[in-house]
Amino acid sequence: MSTAPKAPDFLVVIPARLGSTRLPRKPLADIGGKPMVVRVAERAKQSLAHSVIVATDSPEIQAACDEHRIECLLTSPDHPTGTDRIAEVAQLLKLPSNALVVNVQGDEPLIPPELINQVAQTLAEHPQCAISTVAVLISEPSEIDNSNVVKVVLNREGEALYFSRAPIPYVRDPQELIKTEHLRHLGIYAYRADFLQAYTRLDPAPPEQAEALEQLRALWNGYRIAVHTAPEAPPAGVDTLDDLERVRQLLGNT
């Protein structure tokens, strides 16, 4: 009799800062009486993670987490990316090199816990990879040419060849468009702890700077990224006031 694979041991880190440009003070936005970052942490706690930690440079966010009994670490205000902030957490916790760390964005209060489990499982099943992430098939043709929708092309092993805001793969013959799959990248990652420490020492890569996609730094330096193709897209995160109102209506006073 076959048995299901053992769930990997992992922790979730939620990077959160107040300096959002489109929606000021976004992590502290109220959703049914709780700050958004707390809502995200509560969703993450429904996953199989052994711990969930908010990483922030804001004493206000730390105080909000303390009030709701969410573990929080105060980190440096100088980190250029959320990945750098997570690397500091891995260092502060003295994580072993093979520890798995899942990065959940602080503006995803509706993230399915199963998706968090899946990105960790994907990395555990790909020992040759330093990172795992998630993609979903694009069903709306307009998204293919939308530069705000990041596309990814995979190899036959389910690893990322490239991420781009451009329409990749580019379909030269319009007759081939209907049978060409395009994948949308979703911004959830799992990392090995030793990669996180290496990442902080890597210089920004030319394609990363051109596309404004930090995952290209890993590919540029030869690190491999495993990609799970999800059967459907999760609920969208919160980028605008309209998004926030939508989530407030969905969660209400839960």
UniProtKB/Swiss-Prot annotation:
The keyword Hydrolase does not apply. GO terms for molecular function: 3-deoxy-manno-octulosonate cytidylyltransferase activity. It catalyses: 3-deoxy-alpha-D-manno-oct-2-ulosonate + CTP = CMP-3-deoxy-beta-D-manno-octulosonate + diphosphate. InterPro entries: Cytidylyl_trans, KdsB, Nucleotide-diphossugar_trans. Its EC number is 2.7.7.38. One of its GO terms (biological process) is CMP-keto-3-deoxy-D-manno-octulosonic acid biosynthetic process. Pathway: Nucleotide-sugar biosynthesis; CMP-3-deoxy-D-manno-octulosonate biosynthesis; CMP-3-deoxy-D-manno-octulosonate from 3-deoxy-D-manno-octulosonate and CTP: step 1/1; Bacterial outer membrane biogenesis; lipopolysaccharide biosynthesis. It comes from Polynucleobacter asymbioticus (strain DSM 18221 / CIP 109841 / QLW-P1DMWA-1). SUPFAM superfamilies: Nucleotide-diphospho-sugar transferases. This is 3-deoxy-manno-octulosonate cytidylyltransferase. It comes from the Bacteria. GO terms for cellular component: cytosol. It is found in: Cytoplasm. Activates KDO (a required 8-carbon sugar) for incorporation into bacterial lipopolysaccharide in Gram-negative bacteria. Pfam families: CTP_transf_3. Belongs to the KdsB family. NCBIfam families: kdsB, PRK05450.1-5, PRK13368.1. HAMAP family: KdsB. Keywords: Cytoplasm, Lipopolysaccharide biosynthesis, Nucleotidyltransferase, Transferase.
